[in-house]
Regions:
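Bacterial Sec-dependent N-terminal signal peptides
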Residues: 1-21
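Well-ordered alpha-helical scaffold segments within catalytic/enzyme domains
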Residues: 20-22, 58-75, 106-120, 164-178
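Low-complexity, Ser/Thr/Pro/Gly-enriched N-terminal "stalk/linker" regions
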Residues: 20-86, 121-133, 137-144
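Structural signature of alpha-solenoid helical repeat scaffolds
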Residues: 52, 99-102, 119, 157
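Blade-loop segments of beta-propeller domains
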Residues: 83-116
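Aromatic- and glycine-enriched pocket-lining scaffold segments that form the walls
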Residues: 143-189
Length: 189
C-alpha cells in the first residue's frame, strides 16, 4: 500500500511540475541577457577596490565577451565589444598591479579574446610581458594559504584562482602555440 501511495504521489508531482514548466523562448532569454548586460554597463561597481582591473570586473568581462560575440553575430550589435575595448584602452591593456596574484591577471582573459578578434598587438603586449616575467621569475611563496598573509597569495592556492589565472595561460598557448604557457599553467605559478 505504501509503495502505491509513494508511486502515485511521485506521478502526480511530476505531472504537476511538468504542467507549470514554462519554456523560455530564445528571444526572451536574449532580451533578459541584454538587459543584464546593459544594467552592468550602466551601474559599475562604485567601490574603488573594484576598479576596471580588479577580479570581479575580470569575471564580468569574461561573460561580457561571450555576450558581445552573440549580440554581434545574431543582431549585428557591436556595442558590447566597443565597451570592452574602451576599458582595455583606458587601462592600456594592463593587468592589475600584483604580479603573482591570480586575481590581478583575470582581466587579461577578455583582453586576449579581444586580441583574437581584432588582431591588435597593443591588446596582447602587456599580458605577454606579465606572463613572461612570471615564467622567468617564478614565485618562491608557499603553497600553504595563510589567512592574512598576502605573500601566500602569490601561488594559486585558493579555488577561484583556477578561474582567474590558468585560462590566461591557456589562451596564450592557443594564440601562440608556445608550450611554455601550457607548462606555466600546469605548475600553479
Amino acid at each position: 500500500m505504501r509503495k502505491i501511495f509513494l508511486l502515485s504521489a511521485y506521478l502526480l508531482c511530476s505531472v504537476f511540475v511538468r504542467a507549470v514548466e514554462i519554456p523560455f523562448q530564445k528571444s526572451e532569454v536574449k532580451s533578459i541577457m541584454r538587459k543584464v548586460a546593459d544594467w552592468q554597463i550602466a551601474n559599475p561597481h562604485p567601490a574603488p577596490e573594484h576598479d576596471d582591473l580588479n577580479w570581479p570586473q575580470g569575471a564580468l568581462y569574461v561573460g561580457m565577451v561571450d555576450w558581445a560575440e552573440l549580440a554581434e553575430k545574431e543582431d549585428g550589435d557591436d556595442t558590447y565589444y566597443k565597451w570592452l575595448t574602451r576599458i582595455g584602452r583606458r587601462n592600456c591593456w594592463q593587468p592589475d598591479k600584483r604580479f603573482y596574484h591570480a586575481d590581478d591577471i583575470a582581466v587579461s582573459q577578455s583582453f586576449l579574446d579581444l586580441y583574437r578578434k581584432y588582431k591588435d598587438e597593443e591588446m596582447i603586449v602587456p599580458t605577454l610581458a606579465r606572463t613572461e616575467w612570471i615564467i622567468n621569475h617564478p614565485s618562491k611563496g608557499s603553497f600553504k594559504l595563510v589567512e592574512g598573509d598576502l605573500k601566500t597569495l602569490e601561488r594559486w592556492t585558493w579555488c577561484d584562482a583556477l578561474f582567474m589565472a590558468p585560462p590566461v595561460y591557456a589562451k596564450l598557448y592557443m594564440l601562440t602555440g608556445d608550450k611554455k604557457y601550457k607548462i606555466a599553467r600546469a605548475t600553479c605559478r
